[in-house]
Amino acid sequence: MKPNMHYTELKDTYLFNTIYRKTDEYLAAHPGEHVLKLGVGDVSYPLCKKVIEALHEAVDDQSKIKTFHGYLPEHGAMFLREAIAKYYSGWNVDMTTDEIFVSSGACDDLGDLLEMFDRDNTVLVIEPAYPEYVDTNLLYGRKVIHLPAGEGDGFLPLPDESIDADIIYICSPNNPTGSAYTREKLKKWVDYANEKDAVILYDAAYEIFIEEDDVPHSIYEIEGADTCAVEVCSFSKT
């Protein structure tokens, strides 16, 4: 048996574990200080009443013969996919339930989706970025190109025609920068992906925080995105 030697290409520790450790060390040395945590997008407050009520109702349903059910469809319960389609319709995105897949979480999908692509594909990651983008591709042995974002471009770099990428990661609004692509700028990425025959893995986990009219909540608001993009969203940030 041969191990996957690509594990040796990973960093010694997961980024967020390092952040937790440094935070704990700082608080131990500076007791009483308030630290703003900008690491993992974890919840900060108790769940709202509506969510708690829905959870209780779902548990109660499992105790009654008329409402009990075992495994749900592998791509998600129909009522949930219908609700998601309705949500997207608010952004003028026409989506059928057959195009919606519900999983155990966005993080899992960002890794699982890679099983559809050959290991020889080149990956483009806009930095700074969620560590999962890089780590999962390193485990597959793929070449990863890092496209730095900085103050000069508003942390929103545009495509470089000299780069031939097959898989492109875009997170908008971005964590940790908070920058978000306008429709005009995101269209440039969509056009680039279609031109290069590439796939955009679009991380829309933070779309609920968008307030500007010219910033799309979904990449599918952009013409041409339906032929080059897979959007991964999460309702855990709402």
Protein language model annotation of sequence segments:
Residues 45, 178, 182, 237:
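Nucleotide-sugar-dependent glycosyltransferase donor-binding/catalytic pocket residues
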Residues 201, 232:
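Generic enzyme active-site microenvironment
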Residues 41-43, 173, 234-235:
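Short strand-loop junctions, especially beta-strand C-caps/beta-turns
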Residues 122, 198-199:
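Short glycine-centered segments of the SAM/dcSAM-binding site in methyltransferase folds
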Residues 2-104, 112:
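N-terminal small-domain helix-loop-helix segment of the aminotransferase-like
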Residues 204:
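Walker B catalytic acidic pair
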Residues 7-11, 177, 235-238:
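Glycine-rich "substrate-gating" loop/helix at the edge of Rossmann-like oxidoreductase active sites
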